[in-house]
Amino acid sequence: MIMDFYKKSKTEINMEKFNEIIASDKPVLVDFYATWCGPCKMMHPVLEDVAKIVGDNARVIKIDIDKNEELSRVYQVRSVPTLMIFKNGELKWRTSGVTPAATLEEELKKHY
């Protein structure tokens, strides 16, 4: 399951579909999270704000690690939340833990 803040939708995800999403020429912020994770719950409104601010300049999505174990393994997600920015299929930035909206906006803008 993937939650897309820009499209305001939830859809099933697999490795092929994920690779299509991150191949975008616009930056894609990916939040690897878990439903049982307190800090992940704190990030949800932050990500909503970031998605509104960046608009269609970037995409903000969430990936549930418990429902997408293959993606979690491939991208070596060891703690949640783990946030990554991809552009043209390449990992451009990565961090773990609660991250302020200003930091996420700044990192996304580097890749517009």
Write out the residue ranges for each language-model feature:
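Proteins that catalyze or organize thiol-disulfide redox chemistry
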Residues: 1-29, 34-59, 67-74, 78-82, ...
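Conserved residues in the N-terminal Rossmann fold of short-chain dehydrogenase/reductase
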Residues: 62
